[in-house]
């Protein structure tokens, strides 16, 4: 304990105040990697953090899986990020899920060239989203096929914008399903 070492509170305070007296800077360096190298005389290993699965996960240079997007706010955030991810080029948005859990909120979507809607709630989503080019498809396969056949470049943002509803158990299952279906198209797009 500190008081055992210093004997009493006055000695403890005196020792701590001495730290402030020695405030001459020995380095103006603030980069933690350079400081580590300076102190340990070895180079630190750079740590790379990967995105968590299905949270704006970059699958390839032209595909983003944001299955975790389960509400208006996360969809809006993904749309803002997509402008930079796709370097301001055209992209398609794929949405699905149950808009009831978002209160059938009307959403004006800016950014994507086309919006593809699939699943048992596609017609309800169609009523909620304002965009000039909305396309209801029967399945995720149909959406991916239409994007592959009719859209160049094949940039895709999968950001459902709604909770899974009855179509999927949760966002994780939905994200895995997207990656599985996407697999057969990725080799064609390269």
PLM regions and their residue ranges:
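Short glycine-rich anion-binding loops that position phosphate/pyrophosphate groups of nucleotides
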Residues: 1, 70, 98-100, 121, ...
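Flexible active-site lid/hinge loop adjacent to a nucleotide/diphosphate
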Residues: 1-28, 164-172
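Short glycine-/acidic-enriched loop or helix-start segments at secondary-structure transitions
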Residues: 5, 74-75, 103-105, 126-128, ...
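Charged helix-capping and loop-helix junction motifs
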Residues: 11-13, 105-111, 171-178
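Residue-level signal for inorganic ion chemistry
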Residues: 12, 66, 93, 115, ...
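Nucleotide phosphate-binding/pyrophosphate-handling subdomain across enzymes
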Residues: 31-114
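C-terminal helical cap/extension that packs against the catalytic core
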Residues: 99-155, 190
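Glycine/aspartate-rich loop-and-adjacent alpha/beta segment that forms the canonical ThDP
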Residues: 160-188
């Amino acid at each position: 304990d500190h008081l055992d070492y210093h004997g009493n509170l006055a000695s403890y305070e005196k020792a701590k105040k001495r730290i402030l007296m020695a405030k001459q800077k020995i380095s103006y360096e603030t980069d933690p990697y350079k400081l580590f190298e300076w102190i340990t005389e070895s180079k630190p290993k750079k740590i790379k953090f990967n995105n968590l699965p299905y949270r704006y996960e970059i699958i390839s240079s032209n595909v983003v899986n944001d299955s975790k997007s389960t509400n208006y706010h996360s969809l809006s955030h993904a749309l803002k990020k997509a402008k930079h991810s796709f370097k301001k080029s055209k992209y398609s948005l794929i949405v699905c899920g149950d808009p009831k859990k978002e209160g059938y909120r009307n959403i004006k979507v800016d950014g994507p060239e086309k919006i593809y809607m699939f699943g048992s709630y596609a017609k309800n989503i169609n009523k909620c989203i304002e965009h000039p080019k909305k396309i209801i498809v029967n399945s995720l396969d149909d959406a991916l096929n239409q994007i592959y056949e009719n859209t160049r470049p094949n940039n895709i943002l999968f950001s459902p914008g709604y909770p899974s509803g009855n179509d999927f158990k949760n966002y994780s299952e939905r994200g895995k399903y997207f990656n599985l279906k996407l697999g057969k198209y990725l080799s064609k797009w390269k």
